[in-house]
A protein has these predicted regions:
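A conserved acidic beta->alpha catalytic loop
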Residues: 5-13, 60-61
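Acceptor/aglycone-binding surface of glycosyltransferases and processive sugar-polymer synthases
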Residues: 18, 25, 29-33, 37-47, ...
Length: 203
């Protein structure tokens, strides 16, 4: 069990170290500051050693009860079992609106599959994890990378669950920047638009 602490200041590291004293199978990677979700996920995958790897948030918005079913699909030959929310219960309406618009836009301009409501909660084989780690992008957009590497994936749906404790650090500006990273990383549309505008100014 590997915890990734993204520069928290709420005593998380102290509590995890207590767990480590009780169980040697528990480990932690603690960042010196907040580097963001993408860096945390990459560090977790890089430090993982098992034949199968599960990524999940610790706020319990990713239901652990799905794990048995996820492994059943892996035994049936899937390389990855991914999850998506079919509702956005408890989420601000404006955030839900822009999230839906983002996924709709990506379907139009990108050749890489990105499911609406996709979560980072996912079970993967070691082969898929290694493929993801081989991509050393500086500005990572893991939701796109999952689709780009092309492994056989089963999708499980569930209704959104409100976080058990705490508040999200993702404000509108951070979500906008993250969305722009996804658009520029997995679509040629921005480049084509820039080229077209450049040609117009040269005429």
């Amino acid at each position: 069990l590997l915890y990734i602490d993204d520069g928290s200041k709420d005593g998380t590291v102290r509590e995890v170290k207590k767990l480590i004293e009780q169980d040697s199978r528990v480990h932690i990677v603690s960042f010196s500051r907040n580097f963001g979700k993408e860096a945390a996920m990459f560090a977790g995958l890089e430090k993982s050693k098992g034949d199968y790897v599960v990524m999940m948030d610790v706020d319990l918005q990713d239901p652990p009860s799905l794990l048995p079913e996820m492994f059943e699909w892996i035994w049936q030959g899937y390389d990855s079992v991914a999850t998506r929310r079919v509702t956005r219960k408890g989420e601000p309406p404006i955030r839900s609106f822009f999230a839906r618009r983002f996924y709709h836009l990506m379907k139009q301009i990108s050749q890489t599959e990105m499911m609406d409501g996709a979560r980072d909660y996912r079970l993967m084989t070691r082969q898929m994890v290694d493929a993801i780690l081989s991509m050393r992008e500086y500005n990572r957009f893991t939701k796109g990378i999952f689709g780009w590497v092309g492994f056989k994936t089963k999708w499980l749906e569930y209704e959104n669950v409100e976080r058990a404790k705490g508040e999200t650090k993702w404000n509108f500006w951070k979500l906008l920047v993250y969305s722009l990273d996804g658009i520029t990383a997995f679509s040629t549309a921005p480049l084509l638009i820039a080229s077209f505008v450049g040609v117009l100014f040269c005429i």
